[in-house]
């Protein structure tokens, strides 16, 4: 969780006006007027206007694809044509921000879908380019005026190679067995960045090539993708929920927030996702299962806490009491790390940091980032695990020691990540790692088939260490599945994936409570425990309960409500409000545990 990201709202208002002016309708039986065959084949380099996202989808007179897609799109590096014209800063850590990277993206088509073979952040060979890209499944189809060619579109994200944000985009092209048209893309939304200071959109044509080839293990990939479709949590529009409970109960769901900063929000009720629109500068995003979010510090909970709970289930709850110094080479010039445990690091209570000694009241963000920003940025940009550890161990310690007071520090969570990596390698061998454990033993059993993250960069081709402080890229479906696991005591389909006792502690279902944050809402003071932000809430009966949640930079919020619902709001700036909790309570009253 980083401090509030202040967006340049006026730019987005301009974009929205431009889009509304350019939207065109395609009545049934009429040919499309936007992104036509001629547009895609001629690829006018001056055509860089954002257009409505719906034009990247099948028209009303579309039919099935006329060709099977099997091969690689070869995309060259090209300047991004952005609004505003220049991205600031122009380079970050020596890497250019204005250029799309050169990539080869392999796809296959099946059942009307265009499916990437590699469903992860793609690496490129240019050390001077800032961006990584990840593609998600799209669609293939045909339209009458495309001269016998087929059409395809797909969603993707861009993210900085050291960042935790996601810039949401969509692309389309024509293809047949001989070749492809130009690729038309546009970048239309984003989560809050850290280094990038320009909220931008981008659009343009790219001349691409189609390298046709058989898809290796196509049978297995098709089987896996069809299972992925079967495992999707149903997504329903907000209007469906309104028709069930009445719009008056939902009216202030996003109250207290800046509407222009909300990308989407919603409720997960009885394994159905009821979502508000996926807002962008070009209208609603047309791929709800393919809109991937960089959720920043929500990763501490959805990845970090869940990984610790999985280790506790495998090795015992005592892993929370393991000392960091027994698993890492600590180079600090003080003894502050001597008694710091894995649990202390997850609780943000290491007693390490450059903040003040002011404790009455304590402020959880005292000393966070801006207290020593130059030092923070050096640590942030350090590529390898050893360099990151050496930087973080230079931080001073407080007099009070571990376990006493909470101070929010990404660096402590990274120390935990490195220690967890050391632990699993000692137990399971040098090839074991936390990310593989999470994918194989938690995410895949939940039906999360594709999820991505970032690692440190090590020399000699060695695998990197997982970031836990930020780096997870998820969809609302992923959020619903992880939340359901936590709401279900860590059990899924009769299999206990997470340690039930420690999970109950994290959710305040035992007598153990976390440390005060110095923050409060209208119901009382908040606290922090095991990466969860706990917000007090007064029930209709007058009892006070605690609502645990994940939070991320820019206002990313997920609340695990004790009535079994999950509320989420994904944003890129602005203030928080209590509306989600109030609405959930109206639909299904929250009750205090007896």
Locations of regions flagged by a protein language model:
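Active-site-proximal binding-pocket segments
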Residues: 436-513
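Active-site SXXK
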Residues: 294-319, 345, 416-420, 479-482, ...
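N-terminal leader/targeting segments and the immediately adjacent pre-domain N-terminus
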Residues: 21-287, 585-594
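Active-site helix/loop module of the DD-peptidase/beta-lactamase fold
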Residues: 29-56, 61, 70, 314-353, ...
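Active-site-adjacent helix/loop patches that line small-molecule binding or acyl-intermediate pockets
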Residues: 240-265, 333-448, 474-480, 484-488
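Active-site Gly/Thr loop motif
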Residues: 450-457, 508-577
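Bacterial N-terminal signal peptides
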Residues: 9-18
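Active-site-proximal alpha-helical segments within enzyme catalytic domains
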Residues: 305, 412-422, 469-492, 555-572
């Amino acid at each position: 969780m980083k401090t509030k990201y202040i967006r340049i709202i006026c730019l987005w208002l301009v974009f929205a006006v431009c889009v509304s002016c350019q939207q065109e309708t395609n009545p049934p039986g009429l040919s499309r007027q936007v992104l036509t065959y001629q547009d895609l084949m001629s690829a006018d380099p001056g055509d860089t206007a954002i257009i409505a996202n719906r034009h990247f989808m099948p028209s009303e007179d579309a039919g099935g694809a006329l060709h099977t897609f099997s091969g690689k799109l070869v995309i060259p590096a090209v300047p991004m044509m952005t609004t505003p014209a220049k991205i600031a800063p122009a380079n970050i850590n020596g890497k250019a921000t204005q250029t799309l990277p050169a990539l080869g993206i392999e796809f296959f088509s099946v059942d009307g879908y265009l499916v990437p073979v590699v469903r992860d952040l793609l690496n490129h060979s240019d050390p001077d380019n800032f961006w990584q890209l990840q593609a998600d499944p799209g669609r293939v189809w045909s339209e009458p005026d495309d001269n016998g060619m087929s059409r395809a579109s797909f969603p993707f994200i861009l993210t900085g190679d050291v960042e935790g944000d996601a810039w949401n985009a969509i692309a389309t092209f024509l293809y047949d067995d001989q070749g492809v048209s130009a690729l038309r893309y546009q970048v239309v939304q984003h989560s809050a960045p850290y280094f990038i200071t320009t909220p931008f959109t981008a659009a343009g044509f790219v001349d691409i090539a189609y390298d046709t080839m058989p898809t290796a293990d196509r049978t297995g990939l098709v089987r896996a993708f069809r299972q992925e479709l079967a495992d999707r949590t149903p997504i329903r529009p907000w209007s469906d929920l309104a028709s069930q409970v009445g719009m008056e109960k939902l009216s202030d769901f996003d109250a207290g927030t800046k509407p222009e900063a909300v990308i989407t929000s919603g409720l997960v009720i009885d394994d159905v996702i009821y979502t508000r629109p996926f807002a962008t500068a070009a209208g609603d995003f047309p791929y709800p299962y393919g809109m991937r979010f960089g959720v920043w510090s929500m990763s501490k909970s959805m990845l970090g806490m869940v990984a610790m709970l999985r280790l506790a289930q495998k090795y015992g709850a005592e892993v929370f009491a393991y000392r960091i110094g027994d698993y890492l080479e600590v180079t600090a010039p003080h003894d502050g790390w001597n008694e710091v445990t894995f649990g202390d690091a997850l609780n943000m209570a290491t007693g390490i940091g450059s903040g003040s000694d002011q404790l009455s009241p304590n402020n959880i963000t005292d000393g966070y980032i801006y207290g020593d920003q130059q030092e923070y940025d050096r640590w942030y940009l350090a590529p390898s695990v050893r360099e990151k550890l050496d930087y973080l161990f230079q931080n001073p310690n407080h007099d009070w020691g571990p376990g006493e007071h909470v101070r929010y520090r990404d660096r402590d969570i990274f120390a935990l990540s490195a220690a967890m990596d050391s632990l699993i390698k000692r137990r399971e061998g040098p090839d074991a790692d936390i990310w593989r454990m999470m994918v194989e033993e938690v995410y895949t059993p939940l039906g999360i088939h594709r999820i991505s993250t970032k690692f440190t960069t090590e020399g000699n081709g060695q695998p990197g260490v997982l970031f836990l402080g930020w780096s997870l890229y998820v969809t609302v479906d992923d959020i619903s599945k992880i939340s359901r696991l936590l709401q279900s005591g860590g059990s899924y389909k009769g299999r206990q994936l997470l340690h039930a006792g420690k999970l109950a502690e994290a959710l305040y279902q035992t007598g153990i409570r976390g440390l005060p944050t110095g923050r409060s809402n209208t119901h009382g003071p908040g606290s922090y425990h095991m990466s969860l932000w706990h917000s007090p809430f007064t029930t209709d009966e007058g009892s006070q309960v605690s609502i645990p949640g994940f939070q991320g930079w820019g206002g990313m919020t997920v609340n695990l409500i004790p009535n079994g619902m999950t509320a989420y709001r994904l944003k890129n700036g602005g203030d928080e409000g209590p509306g989600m909790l109030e609405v959930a309570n109206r639909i299904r009253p929250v009750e205090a545990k007896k």
